[in-house]
């Protein structure tokens, strides 16, 4: 009997604790609602409507954030996806192309995620405006690719840029240079959400402005926001009205994410007659990709699992290249009609990413984000396609930039392809030290980009510069210790070499 009483009192105390937590949650939601209403009153008449949509979207996300506890996946339910749910690209390609490529292409809209700044590479303004090859920017190359398609097949594939409030103004200024290109370019903006104080969980912003003290009070809430923002912009309905059926979504800094006609044909003319609503391009993991999100089978559906969702005890297992062999490239093909249906049903479910930041003044804040690929489980008949590594060529650092600027790649109509002169299809591993982090410093340290056709691995650390016509082969490690400087002379050929110490070349 005493055991029963103990269990009952324990249950009652747990029930009381959960009731208390529920009251706290409701109070907090009410406080946030009041703060958001105060912020909305500071919006001008032309800002009011879209600010209200943004703040309503934030409230929904915040409500979900308060409801969720602990890791969002039950590790025991994670299974490898069934064989037929991830198709090899070779199988898709083997079907060939239809005679009417132009009619298939005319059903497509290309969307590039263009919300990021170039700050990690020491550049101001949108990352898409950084020069990556022969003075062409990411945006230039994208426009060239789509113009080439439209001219070759006499089609009308539009380009849509999802900007953020950080990139919109600068991007729009530059777009006029493409007025004479055969590409219709549209833009829409990601939502703008308020950062919240890590302790109080209340918005840091006091008004809608984005200047002065308020500059750091707002953030774009991750690319998962594309579904709501695209819908709210009116572009979704416009394209459906024009007979478009699919969007191809990718990061603008992934130079491998070109329109693939074989994948598009598979979407438009499926072999089993059943259309896919969502296709995610995945590729094989290497040791460098262990943190990338992977496709799994979860409760009978394909699901993207990110490292942040994995319980700590299973992180090493998640990183295992032998168990989880593929990762998400963020190249996605999505049905427009399905996006419209799910958005109107409020049925797009994406896990919340909680991103902790420290503002310049030292205040700890969190921002709530979502990822576009996480919505795969909300769509019907989803599919993964295991594509060649060449479709994943992101430029996140100057080490990546060195690769794409080199003779490892040739440029044709805005697309980069691996040089036929390279004997192996793999990309060299390049690690440039902190002296090369900023694009400006990086460019100053290379008189010309070295020949890297036979390179396997390059590590550079410290104060190092490269003369013209340098050739790097095999494994090359160059380390200038603190206070030393190494100048690699013009015409030098370094093959399987370690260079250290001090080597100065001065003008006579």
From Swiss-Prot:
Residues 457-508 are annotated as: Oligomerization. The modification Phosphothreonine is found at residue 426. GO terms for cellular component: cytoplasm; cytosol; extracellular exosome; nucleus. Keywords: Acetylation, Cytoplasm, Disease variant, Epilepsy, Magnesium, Metal-binding, Nucleotidyltransferase, Phosphoprotein, Transferase. Its main location: cytoplasm. It holds the Pfam family UDPGP. The keyword Transferase applies. One of its GO terms (biological process) is brain development. The modification Phosphoserine is found at residues 13, 434, 448, 461. This is UTP--glucose-1-phosphate uridylyltransferase. InterPro entries: Nucleotide-diphossugar_trans, UDPGP_fam, UDPGP_trans. It comes from Homo sapiens. Substrate binds at residues 115-116, 223, 251-253, 330. Belongs to the UDPGP type 1 family. Changing residue 218 to S: No significant loss of activity.
């Amino acid at each position: 009997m005493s055991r029963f009483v103990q269990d009952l009192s324990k249950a009652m105390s747990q029930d009381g604790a959960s009731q208390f937590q529920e009251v706290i949650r409701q109070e907090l939601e009410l406080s946030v609602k009041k703060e958001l209403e105060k912020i909305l009153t500071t919006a001008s008449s032309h800002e009011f409507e879209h600010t209200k949509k943004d703040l309503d979207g934030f409230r929904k996300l915040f409500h979900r954030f308060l409801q969720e506890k602990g890791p969002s996946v039950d590790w025991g339910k994670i299974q490898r996806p069934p064989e037929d749910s991830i198709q090899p690209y070779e199988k898709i390609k083997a079907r060939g192309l239809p005679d009417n490529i132009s009619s298939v292409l005319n059903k497509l809209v290309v969307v590039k995620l263009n919300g990021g700044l170039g700050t990690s590479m020491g550049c101001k303004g949108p990352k898409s405006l950084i020069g990556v090859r022969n003075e062409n920017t990411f945006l230039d190359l994208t426009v060239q690719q789509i113009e080439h398609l439209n001219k070759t097949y006499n089609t009308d594939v539009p380009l849509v840029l999802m900007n953020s409030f950080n990139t919109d103004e600068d991007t729009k200024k530059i777009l006029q240079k493409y007025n004479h290109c055969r590409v219709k370019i549209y833009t829409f903006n990601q939502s703008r959400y308020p950062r919240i104080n890590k302790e109080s969980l209340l918005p840091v912003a006091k008004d809608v402005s984005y200047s002065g003290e308020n500059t750091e009070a707002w953030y774009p809430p991750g690319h998962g926001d594309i579904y709501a923002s695209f819908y709210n912009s009116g572009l979704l309905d416009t394209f459906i009205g024009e007979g478009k059926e699919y969007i191809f979504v990718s990061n603008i800094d992934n130079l491998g994410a070109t329109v693939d006609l074989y994948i598009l044909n598979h979407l438009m003319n499926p072999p089993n007659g059943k259309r896919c609503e969502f296709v995610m391009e995945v590729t094989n993991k290497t040791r460098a990709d262990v943190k990338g999100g992977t496709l799994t089978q979860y409760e009978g559906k394909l699901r993207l699992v990110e490292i942040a969702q994995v319980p700590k005890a299973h992180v090493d297992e998640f990183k295992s290249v032998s168990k989880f062999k593929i990762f998400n490239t963020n190249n996605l093909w999505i049905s427009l009609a399905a996006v419209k249906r799910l958005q109107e049903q409020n049925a797009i479910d994406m896990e919340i990413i909680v991103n902790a930041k420290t503002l310049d003044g030292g205040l700890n804040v969190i921002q709530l984000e979502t990822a576009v690929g996480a919505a795969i489980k909300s769509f019907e008949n989803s599919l993964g396609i295991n594509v060649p590594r060449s479709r994943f060529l992101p430029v996140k650092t100057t080490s990546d930039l060195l690769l794409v600027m080199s003779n490892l790649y040739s440029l044709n109509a805005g697309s980069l392809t691996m040089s036929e002169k390279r004997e192996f299809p793999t990309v060299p591993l390049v690690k440039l030290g902190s002296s090369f982090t900023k694009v400006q410093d990086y460019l100053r340290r290379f008189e010309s980009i070295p020949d890297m056709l036979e390179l396997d691995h390059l590590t550079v650390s410290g104060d190092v510069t490269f003369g013209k016509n340098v050739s790097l082969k095999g494994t090359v490690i160059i380390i200038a210790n603190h206070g030393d400087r190494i100048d690699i002379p013009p015409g030098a050929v370094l093959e399987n070499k370690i260079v250290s110490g001090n080597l100065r070349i001065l003008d006579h």
